[in-house]
Amino acid sequence: MNQFYTAESVTEGHPDKLCALIADSVLDECLSHDALSRVACEVMATRGQIIVAGEITSLYEPSIPSIVRSVLRKVGYNPARFAIQCLIHKQSPDIAAGVDCSLEQRRNVDGSSPSLQLGAGDQGVMVGYACSETPQMLPLPVVLAHRLTSALTIARKSGAIQGLRPDGKAQVTVEYDEDGKPFRLDTVVLSAQHSPEIPADELCFELTDKVIAPALQVLPPDEDTKILINPAGRFVLGGPEADTGLTGRKLMVDSFGVFAPHGGGAFSGKDATKVDRSGAYMARYIAKNLVAAGLCERCQVTLAYAIGAAQPVMVEVDTFKTGTICADDCLADAVKLVFGLTPAEIIAKLDLLSPRYTGTAAYGHFGRPEFPWERTDQAKILRAAVI
């Protein structure tokens, strides 16, 4: 029986993503001056007001209002329309102590190896996913949804479509055949904020021609595909003026949609000692290398950590019965052999002290080759470890 799968994406002007961009911009500003900054930054944006709160311990003191105004300007909002409130304090000394000196170091495990120096900044479960469905090793609906919102933003910023405003969303439903392969585009939903002057029919034509058609070339609409453009009608009020935004409220957009569970920890605004972020990036890195190695067609990697401990308390691999050489527990053993999974090892392997996080905040954290966790440089080593 055929099945239908849906994924969504939002533009950088969506209020939740605006908050993520601000949070990661604060993080990057700190890291660019002090690579060892500890940052846990949360943002709320509502009509006329942006609140930045959280914990920052750094040798550098960022000018948060300046960062917020810069992000607003780049996204397309008028900074003069927002009051900015900052509620920042330093990281808890109790948490810092557990991160700076891990449980293993305190117990002198393995002679206090440097890889065991850092403890996890919190407990939690992180999930990574990969599949052979697309070149990005992501499910096709996820790829298409992000392409739509990216194309929408490009059309706005380039002036290819006049009258667009920053907020926008996309949703794509793809039909899969009995073999689990995507073969047909069932429904496309595109909501684009616009100026009141642009006629609805003109906007619909422009979005179809300059956003939907180029973004969906890999699986074009057919005569039965339902295309819904601004199905609620008028979309003039948008962004924080219409909806309150928060960091951490687009977890499935940031990751793998409905195709994989989420441990619940958000990414943006957190430095790499927070395994919510770094552990999720490593789990994706592992899953992608397992698929690239030809060891499975799709794969879910789950890691779990205890606060203050360096080594994960769980490493699990699930290939959904697509494994080609050995059982899933064998693959998990190979993962433990090939990959360093302590926070210090993850940070070093994926270069997570570099200020690159603003680029992750919108259009998905995965499937983009500019990020180190998207490399498949461990595929051959993994395969050799199994064989």
Roles of regions detected by a PLM:
Residues T6, G48, S66, R73, ...:
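Glycine-rich, mobile lid/loop segments that gate access to catalytic sites or pores
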Residues E8-V10, H14-C19, L118-T134, V236-A260, ...:
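Conserved phosphate/anionic-ligand binding catalytic regions in large, soluble enzymes, centered on
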Residues E12-L31, A130-S150, K270-G294:
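Alpha-helical support elements that line or immediately flank enzyme active sites
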Residues S37-C41, G168-V174, T225-I229, L295-A306:
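A short glycine-rich, hydrophobically flanked beta-strand micro-motif that places a catalytic Asp/Glu
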Residues T46, R298, A306-I387:
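Internal helix-turn-beta structural module
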